[in-house]
A protein has these predicted regions:
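C-terminal functional module detector
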Residues: 1-53, 221-270
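Solvent-exposed, non-transmembrane amphipathic alpha-helical segments
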Residues: 107, 133, 207-210, 266-270
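Glycine-enriched alpha-helix->loop->beta-strand junction motifs that scaffold or abut catalytic
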Residues: 111, 184-190, 210-214, 231-234
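An aromatic- and histidine-rich active-site surface loop
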Residues: 174
Length: 270
């Protein structure tokens, strides 16, 4: 009898909890009136590469992981050292460590260091890189997100106007659609490639609808000992090796996203 009472209380509690989450996500959440977008207009074409210094191209990756949730500190330390060593051996100038919901300060001694983390922890992979982050935002929605949900999360991350927001792996689990990119705004970059695939089909609706968004390419590496997971997608940035200069270059498009096809390679030596 007591077991049945406990079971019933648990089920009622679970039902109320899920109902609360549904209300917060779909009823209480901010509602936007998205204006109908239009293509870029004007007499001139913006050229981010105008007056660049060809001696200042730096190679960078901002999306790589050294930890999963609840990983012990010693394991994280070993993974961080290994990640740094691998990228340095391949000639990278800027090495970003974007752990989930955690800022890794391993590279803080470098003038180019930009605190970054991957935001988002729900099943549907609506994730963003937050560059120049001062703190972690735990706002997220557990169920499939509406366009309003997606915009609200971006706006909350962008409350600190010094941050740079990058939407990553939009195709994973159908997190975002080309329709979403017709209307979404207030972010800086789209990660157009990672170690697994390209996401270029999402960039056309961004530009076609007049959104000033630039591209990035990053490994999104999780298995550093797997050659196919590291050093195949990166950014060439025209910048000084100083944080503010790097951020300005990314925000103004003074960079090139690069994706190598290494599917046939089997070893690091290749």
């Amino acid at each position: 009898m007591k077991k049945n009472i406990f079971k019933n209380k648990f089920l009622i509690g679970l039902f109320l909890f899920i109902s609360l989450l549904l209300i917060l996500q779909f009823v209480v959440n901010s509602k936007y009136t998205f204006p109908e977008p239009h293509p870029f207009q004007g007499k001139y074409i913006y050229n981010p590469y105008r007056n660049i210094d060809n001696q200042k191209w730096e190679r960078a990756n901002f999306h790589a992981h050294t930890r999963k949730f609840l990983d012990p500190a010693k394991k994280v330390a070993r993974s961080t050292f290994l990640l740094d060593s691998i990228y340095r051996s391949f000639g990278y100038d800027i090495i970003g460590i974007s752990d989930y919901q955690s800022i890794n300060n391993y590279e803080i001694k470098n003038n180019w260091f930009i605190p970054v983390y991957e935001h988002g922890y729900q099943y549907y992979k609506n994730h963003q890189l937050v560059l120049n982050a001062k703190k972690i935002s735990w706002l997220d929605y557990p169920f499939r997100q509406t366009l309003n949900n997606k915009q609200f999360v971006i706006d909350q991350l962008k409350k600190d106007t010094t941050t740079l927001i990058v939407i990553v792996h939009p195709a994973y689990r159908q997190a975002l659609s080309t329709f979403d990119f017709k209307y979404l705004g207030n972010y800086n970059c789209l990660e157009i490639a990672n170690s697994e695939r390209l996401f270029d089909e999402f960039y056309d609706p961004i530009l076609s609808n007049g959104h000033p968004v630039f591209v990035m390419a990053d490994d999104d590496s999780h298995k550093m000992t797997n050659i196919k997971d590291v050093c195949s997608s990166f950014n060439m940035i025209n910048t000084e090796l100083v944080k503010d200069s790097v951020l300005k270059a990314l925000k103004t498009g003074r960079s090139i996203a690069v994706k190598f096809n290494i599917s046939a390679y089997k070893t690091n030596e290749e």
